[in-house]
Each structure stands twice: as C-alpha cells, then as structure tokens.
Amino acid sequence: MTRITLSRLPGDRLRVRDRDTELALATGDLPAYVQAREADRPRWVWDDTARWYPSLLTAGVRVERCHDLRLGRHLVRRAPAADPRLLEGEESEHWDRLRPSAPSDPALFSVDDRVEFLDAEREDARQLAAVAASNEAPRLGLLLAAESAGALAAAEMTHAGVPWRVDVHERLLTDLLGPRPPRGARPQGLEALAAEVRQAFGIPALNPDSRPELLAALRRAGLDATDTRASTLRRLEHPGIVPLLRYKQLAHLFQTNGWAWADQWVSGGRFRPSYQPAGSSTGRWSSNGGGALSFPVQVRPAAVADEGWVFVVADVAQLEPRVLAGMSGDRALARSAQGADLYQGMVDDGAVATRNDAKLGLLGAMYGATSGESGRMVAGLTRRYPQAFGLVEEAARAGERGQVVRTLLGRGSPGLGEDWGLDAEGRPADPDAQARRRRSYGRFTRNFVVQGTGAEWALCWIADLRNRLWRLHDVGPLDSRPHLVFFLHDEVVVHTPAALADASAAQIGEAATAAGSLLFRELSIDFPLNISIVRSYADAGKPGAAVEDQ
C-alpha cells in the first residue's frame, strides 16, 4: 500500500512525499491533490488527524485511510511488545510534545515552534521500524490502523454533526427550568427549588451549589453525610432531600446542556462535539468539548433526523463479557455468549441458577469483587470458566507486582511508576501504604485488559462501518450519504436517508461480525446488536422502534 506523508512548511506550504517523489504544495492546493490521489487508496501519514482532516472535509474531500503519528507514537511507546528506543532520534522530543488538538483550535503553536514543522516521513519510518521489530507486529499493526481509522471517524462525526432542533431543545429547557435567565443568574425553576431547599433546612442564605455549605446544612439537620453525591442523598430521610435531588439534577442540565452549551456547540442545525480518540489509558474515547460522551436522556428529543432521513441506532449487548470470552479463548464462556443474552446463556448452560448470579459473577471478576454475594459467585464461576476468570486474575496479580499489562492487540497499561514505594516526600512508604497502592493498581490492571480490548473491538467496528456506509451510496459528499454521527463506547448512531435505513442497519450488523472475526479468529464470538430505526434519538430502544436483534 502506498504511504503518502504530509509535513507542514513555513509560509503556508507543505511537503508531500509519495514513494520516491517529493513535492511542495501550497496549503490551499492540498484538497485537490488528495482528491486526485484517493483513487489509488493510499494511506495518508500526518502528525495529527484533527489538524489535517477537517479542512479536507470542508472542501468535500473524504479519505479512506491514514496513519496518525501522534496517536501511533503514544501507542508504540507504551506497547510492551515494542522497543521504545527505536522511536528516539532527531525531533523525537518535539514529537513527544504533541498534544491532542481540537478541530476548533485556531493554532496550537506559534509559527516558529518546532512542533509546527515536524518531519512526518522521519517519524513514520521510526514507528514502522518499531512495529516491524516487535514479536507481535501483526497485532500492533492492526491496532495502529484501527486507532487512526477511529481518528478519521471522529473528525467526520464532528464535521457532519448530530442533527439538532434548537426549538425543541429550547422548549425542553423552558419547560424544565423556566425562561432563559440573564448571564450569571439561575433560571426561575432552579431558584424556586433552591428556595424549597433553604426552607426545608431552615437556612435562608444556603447556597445549594456550595458543597461545604450543603454538607454543613445536612449535618446541622442531624444527617450522617460525608459527601453530597446523589447516591448518598437518596439514602437520607429529610423533607429537604427530594427538592435537593431535583435541584441537583436540573442544575446539572443547566450547566452541561443548557442555553450556553447550545450557543457554543450547536450551529447550522447540528450539534458538533469534539471527540478525543484514545483519550483514556484503555483506548476509550473522551471528549475535547461539547460533552460528546455524555448525552443526557433529557435533551435527546432535540436530536431529530432531517426530513426524509432517519437515525439507525445500534448498541452491543454485554460487550466486555463477550470480549473477555474471546480474548481468553474460553470456549465454555463463548458457548454461553451465543445469542442475545450472555447471562441467560450461562444459566441455560447450568453454570449458575439465575441471570442475576451470572451478572454478579462476571462483573465481579472484571472489577475485582472478593466479598459478599458477588465474591461468592466469582469463586464458583472460576471453576466453570477457568481461562476467562484466570486471565483477569493474572492481570490483577501482575498489577500488584507493579508490572504492565496489555490488551489483546498490544496496548500497554500506564506503569505504576518507579517511585511506587515512596511517599509524597520521596521517603520509603510504610508497608500498608505500599500494599494499598499495589492492590489499587491491581484492580486497575484487572479491568484494563478487558475494557481496553473492548475499545479495540469498537474501533474495528467503526473503522469498517464508516467505509461500508460510504459505499452504500456512490454519489455526493460525506453528509449526503449514510454516515456516522455519534459513537459512545458500545453504541453508534447513523444518519441515513430513510430509503437506505434497512441497508445501513444490515451493514452495522455485518461490521460487528467482521470486528469479532478480526480480533478473535480462532473462536466464534457473537456480538448481538439492539437496533432501532427512529426519527428522534429519544425514541431509540422504545417499543416499536427496534428493527431486530442482530
């Protein structure tokens, strides 16, 4: 496959290296060049997808493949199967300085900053050499390709945006909170609830947004509260608790998805969040702004497909337990995972008496339950599924020894650090503190291997799906065809012409099957999907909306 590297040059120009050919282009000429070369299906190599791809999309140019050097360097440097010394060399310290960028950033670096003009070809050669020298080169290569494809999908989703009815959103806010308040003031609905809370606790000046004041009020009322989380408040009995919980719920809506949020993140009838691929250590995505990974049910009615279009919403049932079966090679658990409900499959196979027992045991194994009903279930199921439960147990023990663990494709966990045995002042920590830190890191590594591999499956899913959707309709730019508009760990939302809804749903299912086959070649693992075709995102999963379980 042809690799074409792109590097920025001073003077609003860039250098293109295509095999043995090198040429300089004006930045404004790049879209036409990329469009012409896409027919050859090259892999575009650049420092950061979020810095290169948005302008191409704006020009109507979509690319199939890329290699994101920033993401790749971070991945290879931490991969246990790769030698990080192979990444050293000229400009390596500047590559280490690269940080995630958002499409809205006007300029991350000054024009004389070395990080602005890095040599993509040199860094690409280093990363390719590090992968080639690894004893797990095929897996690492797949992970690098999937990670970069995810970056393309993220940029495309921000570009296309989630169709958004501003009038519906404003009506929801007004119904729940009252009219839009002046800047810095509470809405009428919140102010009324605050007055109820003050009256119930007998403190006229109480600020329910202040955690210290709220804790003091709770204790003054004789309530045993150590924090003000909703889960803690629900356990307390007092006339002020109900209005306080309602206040906290609506205050969160006002702060995170209120009028100011819409002003910043909704434009042209589209909600355009900024995703950060591999934003967490496990490879899961995070948000660079807009709350892309936090989409409250209260505002979902405002996400309405365009006229003549629909949403196809699909989520994976029990992703991480199925991933555990696949990565461990546990055929007994894989048999239980056949069909729509893995937990019920465990019951049907005679592993446990009830579905709740199955859920307690599997989640307990992945999160380290050692006591209570969950701990008892873990002990029993370990004998039934020794490979699956043994994998997470060994990951936990490795973490407790201070060792790094890895996902199926080779993403490495962050290390405990050489100073794990020291306290904050650099002195040897006491044995109890060391043991607590080891156990805490062991709980992290136990979950890391499964959650990280689940993220790899999801990357392979959307990497394949974005190309399948593109091929469903062979005319027009990205947003005139079926396309991804939202992704959340184990859920995708596709915006598609209604006439292509069934075809889009079929492609979502086929991409899920292909991702499972790609990762777990020797073991057949089902990844059933709950699929809905709806006009409003709020209707997904409701009776009458589901097409079928695939």
Language model: regions and residue ranges:
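Polymerase palm active-site segment centered on the conserved acidic dipeptide of motif C
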Residues: 48-49, 175-207, 385, 499-550
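Short, contiguous acidic/charged loop-to-helix segments that flank catalytic cores in large enzymes
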Residues: 259-263, 280, 290, 299, ...
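Function-dense linear segments that define catalytic or interfacial modules
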Residues: 96-97, 119, 274-353
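Short active-site loop/helix that positions an aromatic residue
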Residues: 50-60, 70-80, 214-222, 317-332
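Conserved "right-hand" nucleotidyltransferase catalytic core of DNA-directed polymerases
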Residues: 1-19, 108, 117-292, 308-310, ...
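Conserved DEDDh/DEDDy metal-dependent 3′-5′ exonuclease domain
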Residues: 3-5, 9-136
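Conserved catalytic core of nucleic-acid polymerases
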Residues: 159, 348-487, 493, 498, ...
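Short glycine-rich phosphate-binding loop at a beta-alpha junction
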Residues: 40-52, 204-207, 315, 380, ...
